[in-house]
Amino acid sequence: MRTVVLTMKASVIEMFLVLLVTGVHSNKETAKKIKRPKFTVPQINCDVKAGKIIDPEFIVKCPAGCQDPKYHVYGTDVYASYSSVCGAAVHSGVLDNSGGKILVRKVAGQSGYKGSYSNGVQSLSLPRWRESFIVLESKPKKGVTYPSALTYSSSKSPAAQAGETTKAYQRPPIPGTTAQPVTLMQLLAVTVAVATPTTLPRPSPSAASTTSIPRPQSVGHRSQEMDLWSTATYTSSQNRPRADPGIQRQDPSGAAFQKPVGADVSLGLVPKEELSTQSLEPVSLGDPNCKIDLSFLIDGSTSIGKRRFRIQKQLLADVAQALDIGPAGPLMGVVQYGDNPATHFNLKTHTNSRDLKTAIEKITQRGGLSNVGRAISFVTKNFFSKANGNRSGAPNVVVVMVDGWPTDKVEEASRLARESGINIFFITIEGAAENEKQYVVEPNFANKAVCRTNGFYSLHVQSWFGLHKTLQPLVKRVCDTDRLACSKTCLNSADIGFVIDGSSSVGTGNFRTVLQFVTNLTKEFEISDTDTRIGAVQYTYEQRLEFGFDKYSSKPDILNAIKRVGYWSGGTSTGAAINFALEQLFKKSKPNKRKLMILITDGRSYDDVRIPAMAAHLKGVITYAIGVAWAAQEELEVIATHPARDHSFFVDEFDNLHQYVPRIIQNICTEFNSQPRN
């Protein structure tokens, strides 16, 4: 009996030493792992939908090829969570079809999602959905920790198939949180439990929670194999270092002695943590009734002084607050000018009013002259680009603030800006006094710069201390998108109907050349259901509507439709074709669209063209007549809008048609831009 007891004591001592060495080694290993692990961006497939991912904000890497139409996207700028994450990224322009990293942020569900065609992806409409998301460039915020492994709402997620997810009862460790080493007293307690031959009753949860020994909160686990309870201890939540204040661990009290099914628990440290991610602060999507891309040109010249510069910044901050900045509404950037202009931040730098106001506060004055014309040229060439966050469906607006008067000319720079579709507003403060007017470089500069001279685009303030009074009228005007006339350009504001001669004299080969000419012209325009629309009619003795203005709303679809037009063959009744186009095409044109008819023929008409052409002119249809080979010059001049020299063209051979594309486009734009600005 004594021998047995000695043997048991020897075994206990041996086990104690093993556990002690193991605990020390574990402590060293734990100390080595305190360093935060390097963030690994999780990869997802093109078909992964945002709604399947539980994380409220995360960075992922998309593969190439997500432009494929089989990956459905719902919405524009703000997407329903039923959408493909990577498909939405391509649609928004954050990614191209080669893939890459993106930042995804969950936002509230919407009452409706509008479909649109953008960057090769056709998004679909959806009446409502419970959750939305926006896609941004993968620039992580300071102090925010993003998950290296995504949490999916289904066990059969793509990550699970790749072996990346954890079991249901496991949780990823909180960055910066480490478990304390097992203490000597705990090891002795376990050792005594092993050595004692009698069976001890299991502690109840209440007994565990009311122990008199002061120690950190603990979570108990039971080993199925050894029928032993081991305790994992953690640092107190008050002393635990945090990488992200937005992520907190739940208080483990009340969770003691949980028994995870199938968990292998070894002696010593058994970590079990519960994560609780605080709901993110609500992110405004912006006012959808004021979806504009706005650039403020602020005066940083030396003459303005520091005090007035601060007043100017205060107006900017107030505008940012009043506009309700967001991806579904207005976006705003700031350019400061002096001798030379410089961008402080572009349209996609700050996508909510709070961040924008903070950034405005940090702007410092540059000094120098007041070269406004140079600044307008800079904005026209550099600011409104896709890389800077410019959106195709949002009007481009520039608000120029001028103290006194510019030190350079603005007329030519402003004309180019208007022709590029930019709506220029001017706020002038404290104009030139009578004895200062001799120094003004360009008299009446504001009217030469603004989009229209009807007073809508100009605001004048007698004193800097009255600048705040411009806030409400300015916000109201820039958000009145129906009156932003300069958003309409020669390339985005027309309904263009091609009337194509398909008579026998043309021939199959030449007919394909004519279609290529139509394609080359179409490529020059901005195509969508709200921009330029294209329709086509083919005629011989009879007429055929190939497609109407409302048939296709994207450039690729239009170009494919032109390719599919089949050669008809027959006689040449040009007059009847004009009447048919007026009835079947232009009768369905939108009231706010310029109506352009481009007629191509290779011979004299069998019927009268004078009365149909006059009807077209009276209905406001601007008609271009292009004759090839045997076309009659006098007929072309009758068909064409006055002056005929700008609207009729004769080409000796079909193969030379392509040479006239630049000239026709130039004439269309010259005529558009010569409209009165009042």
UniProtKB/Swiss-Prot annotation:
Biological role = Promotes matrix assembly and cell adhesiveness. Plays a role in spinal cord formation by regulating the proliferation and differentiation of neural stem cells.
InterPro entries with a match to the protein in the record: ECM_Assembly_Org, LCCL, LCCL_sf, VWF_A, vWFA_dom_sf
Per the record's keyword annotation, is Glycoprotein included, yes or no? yes
Keyword check for Secreted, yes or no.
yes
Q: Which residues are glycosylated?
A: 390, 520
Q: Where is the composition biased (Low complexity)?
A: 199-216
GO cellular component annotations of the record? extracellular region; interstitial matrix
Positions of region (Disordered): 154-177, 199-257
| Subunit-structure text | Binds dermatan sulfate and chondroitin sulfate.
Signal sequence annotation: 1-26
- Primary location recorded for the protein, binned into one broad class: secreted
Q: Which pairs of positions does the record mark as disulfide bonds?
A: 46-62, 66-86
One of its GO biological process terms is: positive regulation of cell-substrate adhesion
Organism in which the protein naturally occurs? Homo sapiens (Human)
Query: What keywords would UniProt list here?
Result: Disulfide bond, Extracellular matrix, Glycoprotein, Neurogenesis, Repeat, Secreted, Signal
Q: Which residues form the VWFA domain?
A: 293-478, 495-668
Pfam families this protein is in?
LCCL (PF03815), VWA (PF00092)
Composition-biased stretches (Polar residues): 154-168, 230-240
Where it sits in the cell: the answer is: Secreted, Extracellular space, Extracellular matrix
Q: Which residues form the LCCL domain?
A: 40-133
Identification of the protein by name: Vitrin
Return one GO MF term: glycosaminoglycan binding
- PROSITE patterns for this protein: LCCL, VWFA
